[in-house]
């Protein structure tokens, strides 16, 4: 076969392949055109679906005018001055949301809770710098909040008027928009219906009056609020704690800045999530005596001395720490020369009282000497002595008694077995006597820790009513509320007025400094709210 014949044969063989390639190229071209057409159609349909969703689910007061996406743009040739109006329309469209099923369910629940409550307060907000010559009222946004006053729940309506340009073709003044509405005030709970006064009442009822949630809900039901659940109230409580926690941290720092504090601890049942049983945990209390500030502190329920030691070290505490005879304090600070322990005479007296039936002469002698020490304190109180004068009087009268008691314990106490009640009482007193003697050297120091124990009592009473904390977080939240309420009591501040005000203010203090938050603690707050300082009756 010649070369020409071979080439001819190869051409004949390639012809079918060339025809296939041409056919495939034509098919690819058609498919590409079809794909582009489909992509264009998909974009068009997607835009229409989005537009229909906005019309169907968007809030009626914020709906844009119905515009056919295929309709020619009549404003395409308008001047750049209309850019602001275009931006306004864009912002209004962006604000529209498609509400989830859960949001719609919550709105229905809120309506049911509020439907029987009267509207007793309306706050009408008008946009700033409103020129009524240029703008006309075109609508309003209404937010309904549940507020509380003793014996009544009611609705507070926040009405924000919406104003638009009278002349739709006019240009808004520089820096203004075509539609004006006052900004929404910050609320304690974002999108929540509970106002500051209701949140304050929930805290007050549980931790001041010791009323658990289920009793509160029954009370609110009698006042016209239907459908309220414990989970809802607990959710409100937790969000309120997030608001108040920065105040608590400032209070903690202020307490530990003092150079004379009293400390005590008490138990609080906390639910164990594994065993589902309440476990006895510990809540600490630290009181700045001169400043009358009270801190409750919870650290995973521990009673170890390391808890108070860690707290003191974190804030570099230096000064007197007055406490009972719990060995954890001695262990925590035995190597810290900056912390001087002062013990409590009341605890010493209690041990002697317990020994009265066993050895009356010894116990009565000790009790009589302690009684003399308290009489000296009463003399100082009646004379309204200064701290320096009190110190001098103690050096004159109290020191001889204290030294004589120490000698008595050294000589007489050794005669009795440490297992006997009188032996235990003398051992308890003697091992703490050097710490107790420190009160002689500073007129500010108290003879006992009674004021600290008084702060613990409301927690004990509450424990008998709400029984337990659900978890460690709940116990920490309890510490926050109890700290603020106890400080209010120490400064005669009306706790309802105080909580109502600070819960209202805290949303505006998200980035506040330590000094700014300090002004919201009860002892500072009362200086600008004298009407909320309660006068004591005799």
Residue ranges and their predicted role:
Residues 15, 22, 127, 162-164, ...:
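Catalytic center-proximal scaffold of phosphoryl-transfer enzymes
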Residues 1-193, 234, 262-263, 397-398, ...:
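Short, flexible loop/hinge motifs at secondary-structure junctions
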């Amino acid at each position: 076969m010649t070369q020409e014949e071979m080439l001819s044969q190869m051409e004949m063989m390639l012809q079918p392949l060339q025809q296939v390639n041409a056919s495939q190229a034509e098919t690819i071209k058609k498919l590409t055109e079809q794909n582009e057409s489909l992509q264009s159609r998909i974009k068009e349909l997607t835009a229409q679906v989005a537009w229909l969703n906005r019309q169907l689910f968007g809030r009626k007061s914020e709906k844009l005018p119905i515009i056919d996406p295929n309709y020619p743009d009549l404003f395409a040739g308008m001047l750049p001055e209309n850019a602001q109006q275009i931006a306004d329309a864009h912002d209004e469209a962006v604000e529209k949301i498609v509400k989830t099923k859960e949001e719609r369910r919550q709105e229905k629940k809120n309506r049911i809770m509020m439907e029987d409550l009267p509207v007793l307060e309306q706050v009408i907000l008008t946009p700033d710098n409103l020129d009524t010559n240029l703008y006309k009222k075109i609508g309003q946004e209404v937010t309904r909040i549940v507020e509380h006053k003793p014996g009544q729940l009611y609705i507070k309506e926040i009405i924000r008027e919406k104003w638009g340009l009278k002349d739709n073709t006019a240009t808004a003044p520089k820096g203004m928009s075509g539609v004006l509405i006052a900004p929404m005030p910050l609320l304690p709970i974002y999108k929540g219906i509970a106002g500051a006064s209701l949140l304050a009442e929930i805290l007050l009822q549980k931790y001041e009056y010791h009323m658990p949630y289920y009793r509160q809900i029954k009370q609110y039901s009698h006042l016209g609020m239907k459908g309220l659940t414990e989970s809802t109230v607990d959710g409100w409580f937790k969000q309120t704690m997030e608001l108040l926690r920065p105040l608590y941290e400032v209070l903690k720092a202020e307490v530990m800045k003092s150079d004379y504090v009293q400390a005590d601890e008490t138990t609080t049942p906390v639910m164990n999530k594994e065993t589902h049983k309440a476990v006895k945990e510990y809540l600490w209390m630290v009181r700045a005596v001169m400043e009358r500030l009270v801190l409750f502190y919870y650290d995973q329920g521990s009673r170890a001395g390391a808890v108070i030691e860690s707290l003191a070290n974190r804030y570099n505490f230096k000064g007197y720490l007055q406490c009972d005879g719990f060995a954890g304090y001695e262990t925590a600070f035995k190597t810290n020369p900056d912390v001087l322990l002062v013990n409590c005479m009341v605890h010493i007296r209690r041990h002697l009282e317990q020994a009265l039936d066993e050895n009356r002469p010894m116990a009565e002698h000790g009790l009589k000497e302690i009684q003399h020490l308290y009489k000296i304190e009463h003399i100082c109180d009646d004379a309204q002595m200064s701290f320096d004068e009190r110190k001098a009087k103690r050096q004159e009268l109290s020191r001889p008694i204290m030294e004589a008691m120490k000698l008595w314990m050294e000589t007489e106490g050794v005669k009795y077995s440490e297992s006997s009640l009188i032996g235990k009482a003398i051992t308890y007193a003697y091992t703490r006597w050097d710490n107790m003697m420190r009160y002689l050297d500073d007129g500010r120091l108290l003879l006992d820790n009674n004021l600290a124990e008084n702060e613990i009592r409301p927690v004990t009473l509450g424990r008998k009513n709400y029984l337990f904390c659900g978890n460690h977080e709940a116990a920490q939240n309890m510490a926050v509320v109890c700290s603020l309420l106890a400080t209010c009591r120490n400064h005669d501040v009306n706790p309802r007025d105080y909580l109502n005000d600070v819960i209202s203010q805290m949303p505006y203090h998200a980035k506040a400094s330590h000094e700014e938050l300090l002004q919201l603690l009860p002892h500072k707050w009362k200086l600008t709210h004298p009407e909320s300082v309660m006068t004591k009756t005799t």
